[in-house]
């Protein structure tokens, strides 16, 4: 038999300029329908990737590992970033947007970016115009607290923006006293100041659970609950504790995670819900009235009624709920973890320092951005745990295998073990006996939602028994 050959397609007759023109029309149409139309109604959000520089040097941080890939130093020029941000603000108001602006960046609140960025936003939004965000969200490592001058400036900024109807909401990326070894070491005095500051402004915390620090997390969680109780900050006890979704998880570290979430689940059942099984079940199934002000909870069964309707998008900024824009070049990507040149969707153009239109560079990632669902991913679509899985990190998947849509095996092992463990634990506690009590029988969507939940739970339990 002769060698098999892959047919080579002759593209000599294709008008590439026409193809690019059509792709640009398509991309601009998609952006308008899937993002801009929502932004005008205050829905979804824009994620501003301002700077890729951070001095914290956290052991698990992707910016530490992949900074030059995701935000090359050569494109992060101060004057360019500031001019592009000014053009972005003009475009935001001219487009009649009112959605959340989310700053996802390195450590910038102690740099010269801070005053310039906030001054530009204040000048743009201080009028009574409706075209401004109600919330500006800033995840930050809160190291500015150690600098008295910077700390006072941030306090001033918060009050200044509150006076024009904008809540600057900060999320504290601080792991805690017993997990400081992989990050910046902080003093007890620092933590007291941090929590008083967060309490004053109703800020929450999003410490990370990594394969390296998970061994310390039971003691770390106790510390968080104790210090938040000491400061009488009950609202702050809803700490995020998101797992670092990378390939470093081993069988040993996964076992340590299971011990940790077992401890947290018991603690919440005993202390937060006073052993009320129905209320606890409503919380772990993310029933709206129980989780109104909560964030990701690593002891809940991550679930959304949207899954029943085929809207099972990955639960991070890679979903169609967020449009990321990098200020160094006004480009957009699927998310801040996938800003590799070959995956960058395209960039906004400027004429006379005004954003004019959008030019697509890679149309494929745009389709992934608006349409990729867990139920379509290889290795995920037939998984019985899919309805309870928060999903993997596309950026990490790409770095491991060059396949955006295939979860790295260690991450898959992590969530299979965790989800199976939680479902079995809650079943053994008798929580699922109360599912029917949560259902409003007159609400067709609720009936469908909880019926589907029961089916998924029973499938998982049957697989565990098998």
Model regions and ranges:
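Short Fe-S-cluster ligation motifs
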Residues: 85-105, 407-456
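Radical SAM/AdoMet-radical enzyme domain recognition
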Residues: 82-104, 111-250
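C-terminal accessory region of radical SAM enzymes
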Residues: 258-307, 337-390
